[in-house]
Amino acid sequence: MGGAATMLAVASMVMAAKLRVRLRLLIPAVENSVSGNAFRPMDVVPTRKGITVEIGNTDAEGRLILCDALYEGASEKPAMMIDCATLTGAARVALGTDLPALFCNDDTLADDLIAAGRRVTDPMWRMPLFKGYRRLLDSKVADINNVSAGGFGGAITAALYLKEFVPDDVPWAHFDMMAWNNTSRPGRPEGGEAQAARAIFAAIEKKFG
């Protein structure tokens, strides 16, 4: 929900500023209740791209719907594609609660976002899409597993999972965030926070405004 709220905030700012940009907002939202047809560990499910996914952990459900949204969004070959998600606890372990982890397949887009974050005091930290860890998502019964073997590098492997659904020629940025303030600070009250929203808007405004 935190990632969806962040992207809604970005869309609201873009529309309020009347930027000359075609913006498409995709929010994958599904029921997540336990029922007789709920998915189970070791299930194999298809995706919009046609890739099959082994369910290694049912708690890694967010990436299962986000990957379909990314594949759909990439089908239009956008000038940039950005997603935000409260995807992993591993990103919090690595960077704490105040710094969203940025994963990006395009150095120019990453530099633009980081520079925008500095301008508007909306910090982030770039993390690697280390290709060597892709092997940790291998599955014996499907094209890919939804979690890594062993659990190490969880934020990286989650981002690598999503990368499978984004063509290399589509500039893409993925934010793995907390979207919450545990304590109040000046300008940042305790509670939900649209982390990276101001930075994303500032980058879009500079590029398309």
Please describe what each predicted stretch is.
Residues 1-209:
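A generic structural signal for tightly packed, nonpolar segments enriched in small/aliphatic residues
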